[in-house]
Structure formats: structure tokens, C-alpha cells
Amino acid sequence: MKLNRRSFVKTAGLGGVAITSSPFIDLLGNLPRKVEVQNPFNRVPVSLIIDDSTCLVNMAHYGIPQFAEVSPNQYKQDWRKLPREIPDTFVREFGEWCHENSVKGKYSVVPYPACTGWISRFIPGWTKKELEDSLNLIREVIVPDWDIHPEMVSHTRVIDIKTGKPYPDPTPAFMENWEWSQTKSSDELAAYQAYALSIIKEAGLPCEGLTTPGGYAARNQNNLALSTLQAVQDVFGAEIPHYFRDLFTDKGKSVAPQVLHASNLNGTDPKCVVSILGCTSDWFGDWDGLHPGSPDMFITEDLLSGRMVDVIDSAEPAIMVCHWPGIYFNGDKVGFNILKQVVKRLNQKYDHLVWMKLSEIARYWAAKELTNIKLDGNILTLNAPFATPGFTLKLNFNPRHPGLRIRGEEIKPFAKVNDKRAIKDHTWYSDKAGSILCFNLEKGSNELVL
């Protein structure tokens, strides 16, 4: 029985892949054989999305007056009291703490932050050396654990990419957060996004995806997906582009990544784009750094409830969302301290989480959704358009001596572990309910000999 992942999911929901013939006996007697793709390393992915970050500039200080010019009744914060800078000393403190505690995710670098200056050239108010040091800090401390995204060009005014200047009219029609993007074609969005991505590239930063500022393309999502695929591949050559646009906080609503516009899956140049969904609102310190949140919104002190508990217990990726000004909170670090409490509580409650970058989650979900799986006797064949580490399968039967064969090479036996928590690359676990196998899925043909 040969299934691609989309039909495979439907079958799995009714009991998995049913195989009626087999040369060996399993512990479940005559039940139909099932193969189901699990989470990576049999763990629940968790991640943190950081919006409104960039080099040096406090986006709240410079952004609020630009938003207020368009909507004066909505943006009444006293932006002059906010610091103009979020210092690199805090970037280092935050990045090093996250690294020590395995926290990973996405870190925006707004290319032309609130129209103050270009991260790849200069930003008035800071020296050239200060900007270079800030970029070096991001490369050395942030990049190892975080995906870098542009959050379009300025996050405030729309830029005329022919001139590099903001359009003259301060109206919703020419703000990145609001109306400009809602009626643009995929080619128009791709050109604008490529402009932002090219600044990230010129600054010497890696990138596989992008983040939308505010309501950017909220009513134009198909073109957003197509334009992300086009722009990220054109500028950076990323194999699996991804983007963050939406979050959902309603209990029971799926927040699983969405694999979109898959094509040429059996060819030499397969394509897709992945929409990453957040599962929380900003309950850290808000986008302006003026409204303290609470760790209880994520996970309560008794560890029994909260949005992260809901999502983790559903086994979907639990991806928190915050804004850099709220993490710094004008030097009081309110959001940062809330993050520390949340991570501490998650560690107290769970022992089956894995922190991942958004690109790592996107890659796994692309492989999970698009790999063709065929079980024939004691041979399980997986034809994968994309490789991914930690690919994990659950079988409702127990093989005797499972091994992996890649492209006709010798069979490499799996090492057996006696605890699910010990599952890692090229190991397997079994009990009365069946078995779990974990391995690095290679692009192309993979054979599991069971």
C-alpha cells in the first residue's frame, strides 16, 4: 500500500497504514499493521518567536510616533519616555541565558528599523563600530540558536523599493502593518520581501524565512505564501522557506505547521513553503514594553494549566510569541524574567520537550507531510523529498532486528533503548504496544529493514 503523507494522514487517523501480510509475528496478534509519523525524537517541539528585534534600535520608541501619525486615537503611549536603544549588553545576556537553557526560536532583525537607518550600512545615532559590533554579536550569540528573519523593511512605513524612500503619505494604505499588502500580487509581495531579505544578506546574516509586521497580508495569505517561497529561495536559496504570520490562542484549535504549495516532489528540485503558527499572545511584556504579562498565562505555578500545557498535551508544536521591547521592558527585563519562570515550570512538568528553531520545525513538518511511505513485508520504504534529523515512526508491532539502508548501502542496525526518553538518532524502543524508531531521514530513498 503506497500513500503520500496527505492521504496517509487520513488513513492514520482511522488506525494508520493497514498491512495484512507479514513474514513475522507481532505482539498484537492479528491486528492490522500501522505506521505513524511521530514528533521529532518522540518529543514535543517548543520554540519562541521574538518580533520587533533589530540592531540597537528600540522599535517601540521609534515606531509609536509613526503609528500615532496614522491613528492618533489608538497610539497614545508616551514614547519619549521609552529608551531609544535596547543595548547589546542585554542581547548578550539574553542570548547566553537562552543557550545555557537550550531555548531556541526566531529572532527578527528589522532591516530598516522604523526608517532610522540601514543595518547593512549605518544607523544615525550610533557609530559604524557600534553597528558592526551589534551585527557580530547577533552572528556569534544569536544565530546558533535562532533563525534570523526580516520583519519586512521598516515595520512602519512602506518603502518605495525603486528609490529606497518611504512613500510620502502617512495613511494605512502606505503602512506595512495595515493596508498596502492586502491587495498586492504574489510577484509584488515577493519583490518587496526580496528587498528586505537582500538587506539581511548584505549584513552578513543567514536567513530561511520571514516574519510579517502586524497585519501584513492578513487578507492576502495565498499570495503571501507564494511570495515567501519565491523571495526566500531567490535571495538565500533556502530549500524549505518558512514564515510566521498567525497565532491562535483558542483551546482546541490546531497550531500545527501548514505545509503549502508543494510541487515537484518526485523531481530533483522539490518545493514547498511552511507557515509556522504561534500558540500564545504576547504575555511577556507586550509590543511596546509597557504592559507586564504573567507566566501563569503560559503555565500556572501548580503546573496544571495554561496555554502551553494545552498545546503540549495535544502533542503539537508549542510556539510562544513575544516582542523584543517587552522582553527588555525598558531595562526592567520584565518579559525576560517571565520567560525564565515559564522555562523553569516547563522543565518541572515535562521531560519530553525539544527546543527547535522555526526552520528546524518547518523542515521536519515538510518531511512528515510529504514523504511517501510504503510497507511491503518486512521492508518499510520512505521516499523523501526533504531530509530531516530525528525522523520518528511508531509501529503497532515489534520488529526483531531493525536496520536502516540508504541508497543500497549496507544495513545499519538500530541500537535498542529501554526508555522512551532515551530515544535519539538511530535508536529504537519497544513495549507491548509496539515500537518507536528514530533516524536521520535522507533525501531520496530510505529503507527500514524490520
Regions found by a protein language model. Give the residues of each.
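Well-ordered, non-membrane alpha-helical segments in soluble/globular domains
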Residues: 80-94, 125-135, 186-194, 223-232, ...
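Short catalytic/ligand-binding loop motif for oxyanion handling, primarily in non-cytosolic enzymes
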Residues: 55-58, 113-119, 156-162, 216-222, ...
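N-terminal secretory signal peptides
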Residues: 1-3, 7
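N-terminal export signals
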Residues: 7-27
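Catalytic cores of secreted or luminal carbohydrate-active enzymes
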Residues: 333-367
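Active-site beta->alpha N-cap acidic-glycine motif
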Residues: 32-147, 154-156, 194-217, 296, ...
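Active-site-adjacent pocket scaffolds in enzyme catalytic domains
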Residues: 30-40, 45-47, 53, 127-128, ...
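C-terminal beta-sandwich/jelly-roll accessory domains of carbohydrate-active enzymes
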Residues: 368-450
